[in-house]
Amino acid sequence: MKHLWFFLLLVAAPRWVLSQVQLQESGPGLVKPSGTLSLTCAVSGGSISSSNWWSWVRQPPGKGLEWIGEIYHSGSTNYNPSLKSRVTISVDKSKNQFSLKLSSVTAADTAVYYCAR
C-alpha cells in the first residue's frame, strides 16, 4: 500500500517537483520610493529555451500571490494589466536568465517576489 501511495503522489506532483531545473532570484532587498526594482532569475539544471514561459509573481504581506507577467524564451511578453505600464520582463539566453524591472515603486509594491516557470 505504501508503494501505491508513493506512486499516486509522484504522478500527481506538479511538473516543477519532477524537474531538476532550479531558479534563483537575485537583486536588492530594498528600493527607494519612486525608484526601480530590478531582479534577475538565474536558471540552472536546464536551458531557458526548453520551457515555453517564464514568470514573475509576488506576494504582498498577508495577501495571496499576484501574477506580474511572463516571457517566452523568444522574448514575447504578457503583463498583468494593472502593472503593465511599469513592468518590463526580459530574457538573456546567453546567460540563461530572465529579469524583471518594476519602475516608480511605492509602498504598495512591498512584497516577496518570485520567479517561476
Swiss-Prot record:
Protein name as annotated = Immunoglobulin heavy variable 4-4
* Keyword hit for Disulfide bond: yes
- Region of interest: Framework-2: 54-70
Q: Indicate whether Transcription appears among the record's keywords.
A: no
**Described purpose of this protein according to its UniProt entry:** V region of the variable domain of immunoglobulin heavy chains that participates in the antigen recognition. Immunoglobulins, also known as antibodies, are membrane-bound or secreted glycoproteins produced by B lymphocytes. In the recognition phase of humoral immunity, the membrane-bound immunoglobulins serve as receptors which, upon binding of a specific antigen, trigger the clonal expansion and differentiation of B lymphocytes into immunoglobulins-secreting plasma cells.
Protein keywords: Adaptive immunity, Cell membrane, Disulfide bond, Immunity, Immunoglobulin, Immunoglobulin domain, Membrane, Secreted, Signal
Start and end residues of each stretch annotated as Framework-3: 78-115
Which coarse location class describes where this protein primarily resides?
secreted
Cysteine pairs bridged by disulfides in the record? 41-115
The record's listing under SUPFAM superfamilies reads: Immunoglobulin (SSF48726)
Where is this gene product found? Secreted; Cell membrane
Which biological process terms from the Gene Ontology are attached to this UniProt entry? immunoglobulin mediated immune response
Domain of life, per UniProt, equals: Eukaryota
Q: Which organism is it from?
A: Homo sapiens (Human)
Region entry Complementarity-determining-2: which residue ranges?
71-77
* UniProt xrefs under InterPro entries: Ig-like_dom, Ig-like_dom_sf, Ig-like_fold, Ig_V-set, IgHV
UniProt-annotated stretches for the region Complementarity-determining-1: 45-53
User: Which Gene Ontology terms of cellular component type are present?
Assistant: extracellular region; immunoglobulin complex; plasma membrane
- Signal peptide span: 1-19
